[in-house]
Amino acid sequence: MALNLRKNHPILKIINDSLVDLPTPSNISAWWNFGSLLGICLMTQIITGLLLAMHYTADTTLAFSSVAHMCRNVQFGWLIRNLHANGASFFFICIYLHIGRGFYYGSYLNKETWNIGVILPPTLMATAFVGYVLPWGQMSFWGATVITNLFSAIPYIGQTLVEWAWGGFSVDNPTLTRFFALHFLLLFVTVGLTLVHLTFLHETGSNNPLGIPSDCDKIPFHPYYSIKDMLGFALMLILLATMALFSPNLLGDPENFTPANPLVTPPHIKPEWYFLFAYAILRSIPNKLGGVLALAASVLVLFLVPLLHKSKQRSMTFRPLLPFLFWTLVANLLILTWVGSQPVEHPFIIIGQVASFTYFTXILVLFPIASVLENKMLNL
């Protein structure tokens, strides 16, 4: 009998077990497409980022000009830059939807997969933040100044830490060069974590919309889900291309078309849209250290989700109260995102404070209480 290379070759076997013969639940919906879409986003960012790095100069006097040169004189440089900038937005859209799906369907009960997954968004946020500084526009410079300054809230070592991160007494050339190095380095951290995430996922297998064991009804990943994923890739890449070609600056800040000037502060310093919910939580607490802790907690609170699962059912599909609370949380996050983009004045301050309080209360208090109530209602 001929040797099946796909199943016996040490390297091809790993690929085969992950993408071809992987036993997959037969009923997973389009919400399960976002994992593979994140993989495509990562590949797109690596390719476009590498091409941009070939033309970029990490120096305060040349960075802005090198980006302008890229868009004017490099073959399709404008397109590569637009794909990279908007690709980051699509990356965050996909990761937020992916987390939301895991939250709704109880995928967080695969604890190892979930915990590695929760480390990924902060890594991605750090990567996007240092990347945003590289074009050295006004918002790049002032965003870097404001966010790195948050580390000074750490007692005793804060100020030293900030000056060490800056490589001087303000954001300047050493900061830019190290941020370029970090942007490149964090990419590999992201890739490594992604592989660990996938390894843990394939240990347990995928969850499904019903939240019940699916061992009795599994189908091979290829051709069923490989085709389904390809449809997802096509749709997302069409959307990304449309955005990059028709409205590339829709999500950017006009302030970043002005070269960085330490002597002129922009009227509203705000990060990219995908950080606004966390930025709103940071701003809603008047104390600096408290704000920084709340900012960290806004993402790291996801580590507690498996511990707060009190329901006898895994998924929210058939639960009477939880879907309502879940969509309230989604609306709350949208309100936080909107508030983060507004100036710090009445009524936005109080709206941000209420929304921040509701965000943590919903996850830490209301979800567990509602789960216990449901168990009582359904006599479980």
Swiss-Prot record:
Additional record remark: Heme 1 (or BL or b562) is low-potential and absorbs at about 562 nm, and heme 2 (or BH or b566) is high-potential and absorbs at about 566 nm.
Entry cofactors: heme b
Binding-site list for heme b b566: 98, 197
Cofactor note as given: Binds 2 heme b groups non-covalently.
Functional description taken from the UniProt entry: Component of the ubiquinol-cytochrome c reductase complex (complex III or cytochrome b-c1 complex) that is part of the mitochondrial respiratory chain. The b-c1 complex mediates electron transfer from ubiquinol to cytochrome c. Contributes to the generation of a proton gradient across the mitochondrial membrane that is then used for ATP synthesis.
Name the UniProt record assigns to this protein: Cytochrome b
The protein's assembly and partners: The cytochrome bc1 complex contains 11 subunits: 3 respiratory subunits (MT-CYB, CYC1 and UQCRFS1), 2 core proteins (UQCRC1 and UQCRC2) and 6 low-molecular weight proteins (UQCRH/QCR6, UQCRB/QCR7, UQCRQ/QCR8, UQCR10/QCR9, UQCR11/QCR10 and a cleavage product of UQCRFS1). This cytochrome bc1 complex then forms a dimer.
Transmembrane segments: 34-54, 78-99, 114-134, 179-199, 227-247, 289-309, 321-341, 348-368
UniProt organism field: Gymnorhina tibicen (Australian magpie)
Gene name linked to the record: MT-CYB
Binding-site positions, a ubiquinone: 202
Keywords of this entry: Electron transport, Heme, Iron, Membrane, Metal-binding, Mitochondrion, Mitochondrion inner membrane, Respiratory chain, Transmembrane, Transmembrane helix, Transport, Ubiquinone
